Amino acid sequence: MENDKKHNQKQNNVDENEFPNSKVLLVSVKRTRRFLERTARELLAGGTRYIILSGLGDALPLCVQLQSSLQSKNAANVVKIETSYSYFNSNYSYTPGLKIYMEKHPEFKGSRISPGYVSFHEKTDSFTPIYDENPNEYICSLNAGDNNLYVGGEGINGAFSELLSSHNQEVDKYESLFKELLTKAVNENGEKPDEEVKSVLYDNVDKKYPDVKLALCRIRNSLKKGSDHSTGSVFIVTFKKNFPHKKEKNMGMVYVVGPKGKNYNSVEEFLDEVQETAENLMTTLCDYNGLVKREEIKHVRMNTCRICLFSGSIFKHPNASKLDVAKAILNGLAVGYRHGPSPRLNFAYDENVFKDAWVETTGLQVFNHNEQ
């Protein structure tokens, strides 16, 4: 047994020297090929250069099938194959083994976000609805907010105000709620690097804000302007009552304060901050679902988040296109993506830029929302 450990450690060192920036994917018949292929693609999309497919015994056929699938889809190419025949004391027998070394294909794009988690609205005679009249799953919808943290005004922020007010919500109170939450988030996280920032909750929120069941906020310190931490901040509120279209599955609002193009001299800086905001958005969504998994009796999981083009239209930089903004949003979401806690992402229609951005940045197929 000790000799086996030493041999494995020596082999790992050889692999690391010959194939830097590599990951070993253990292939087992307990996992489906679809799961293994998705994992391999996520690793490649995340920056891994080499995937080492490793299987023993009855997993060998699956290992070869996985290699064939990745190669046929221009995800990775085979650079080396090793076979082995090892004796295992545990079952007193020899077991065949296989290692297939694959390098990322030069044309591979991919995304850390599983394609099945992404859907796109098609063009209709009117805007994509903020909420569905008959939702079949728990959904939050994204509101492109303002640095002053109010719900109202023009664009989708005004549409949120009109819709929520029509269902007897006290919309004017959201501004004070968000400002209190932002202050708490800054007090607890304002001096931390972004990777150490935590989402903060408003304790007993329904006592002061009776429409709200849960409220949380996560800031992005790298985007603060002077003492103002609002840019890049993300708020999630779930409703306690007065649900849109009187449907409990229209569960809440995600309020995102994206950067405004007029505040940036460089279009590159603007798009970088859109991407950072989107990364913070995804992290906050995952934080929420992670929280409710621990407290599922009190709160429900967010199955889907409907996402509009924040920092787009009149708020984008004059030298940026809507497609540029959509790409920055998708790239940021991919950076923050965690497969377990992430909700599915449903993108609102806006000149088809989200679907175009997905195809251009990932090379992956799209799923039609209307066929879900």
UniProtKB/Swiss-Prot annotation:
GO MF annotation list: DNA binding; RNA binding
A cellular-component GO term for this protein: nucleus
Subunit structure: Identified in a TARE6-associated complex consisting of over 30 proteins and including ALBA1, ALBA2 and ALBA4; the complex binds to the non-coding subtelomeric repeat region TARE6.
Name under which the protein is recorded: DNA/RNA-binding protein ALBA4
Source superkingdom: Eukaryota
CDD domains, A to Z: MAF1-ALBA4_C
Cellular compartment(s): Nucleus; Chromosome, Telomere; Cytoplasm
Ranges in coiled-coil conformation: none
Species whose genome carries this gene: Plasmodium falciparum (isolate 3D7)
Keyword Cytoplasm belongs to the record: yes
Family: Belongs to the histone-like Alba family.
Major place of residence: nucleus
Alphabetized UniProt keyword annotations: Chromosome, Cytoplasm, DNA-binding, Nucleus, RNA-binding, Telomere
InterPro entries given in the database record: Alba-like_dom_sf (IPR036882)
Described function: Possesses DNA- and RNA-binding activities. Binds to DNA fragments longer than 14 base pairs with relaxed sequence specificity. Associates with the subtelomeric TARE6 repeats. Regulates the abundance of transcript sub-populations in a stage-specific manner. Regulates activation of male gametocytes. Participates in the coordination of sporozoite development in the oocyst.
